[in-house]
Amino acid sequence: MRNLLLLTLTIGFAFPAFAAKEAPMAKVTVAQLEQELATAHDRPDAEVAQQLSGIELTERISTAKLTRLKANLPGSKAQEALVILADSAAFLGPPAGEILANAAPDAAAARQMLTGIVNYVNSTVRQLPDLMAVRDTTGFEDKPQEDVQGETGIATVAAMPLHSVGRSSVMVTYRDRQEVVDENALKHGPKVGGLEVKGEFGPILSRVVADALQGKITWGRWELGVGGKVAVFHYAVPSEKSHYPVQFCCVFDWNAFNGIPDIRVFREIVSYHGEIVFDPASGAILRITMEADLSAGELVSRAGIQVEYGPMEIAGKKYICPTKSVSILQAHTAQQSGMYSKQHYKGSTKTYLNDVAFGQYRRFGSETRILTGDGGDSSQPRGPSSADAPYSPPSRTATH
């Protein structure tokens, strides 16, 4: 069956222009970025934004450092460019200065830490009280260069780098192990593009840990976190053990009999890998990443999500809750604007990026507190309950 991809609700502005060769991106470290931005507050906003759009980070920048750098920028354009720069590097390793040289734990110590993670996830999902929070999402998309059929002929539309396509602020409720979004606000509120993610409050944690226990978990490194030393495990999950569906809307399936395409959603369970960053004493997960194992030639060539967690004070008590997430999806365009569909056409890769911040937490219902758990006496870590709520990974779907 021949497939043709249709990107629905693609947002962006196109300006006819002659094709131009893009200048190579300058690769910089976090330390070099800090040096470049040391005097940014004295320069025009647009100038700093232009400078940031021409560089690429070679390592991840911490949220604390990102917040500090944003505060020193002259305006919203530069701040947006910095967020795009930082989020694009969210799945990279940390700067060398944040990697600690402490010896790796022995097998017994590593197993005890893994047991602590499992206990923490089980207690978090089962005993997290009913909460409400505001999820602020900024959606970014780029626009690949393409030839467009206009009224007077074919014109080349210049490529556009990642840019904001919308923002939304919706109330999210975590209740009875289920994450519920205010659908009315989603329907009538501002749109942020087509990338949708949910499940940060617990389902992602339980599903990744359960899958990782069926896959491969290895020691990563010690890192310097906000509160001191944190530990990192690497994990890899094969497709036969995976519960990670990559979803994309929409694909044209051409009917060989009448030539009329049937629109369907592309969905595939994929193998994936990532990192679990945690407090070695309590097992509390502070950061988790998921990256699908996809090849550059596939319909969807990249999909991933990173979620950060931190202590939030709610009604006088502290709970570990989501504070930030970054999700990304890359897919090939297959529908040329203003032109007839080509059954074998495969265009450039288009990127969708969501930056999400959680805040304004409030609590209702039970007085139950989160328990962090410890290693216990169990010799075999037990995975999270299969009753845990499912999550929705990064997906490009039609927004109504």
PLM segments and residue spans:
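Intrinsic disorder/low-complexity segments
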Residues: 15-21, 390, 399
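Bacterial N-terminal signal peptides
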Residues: 4-16
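Helix N-cap / beta->alpha transition motif
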Residues: 29, 277-279
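Structured extracytoplasmic
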Residues: 92-273, 280-286, 292-305, 309-322, ...
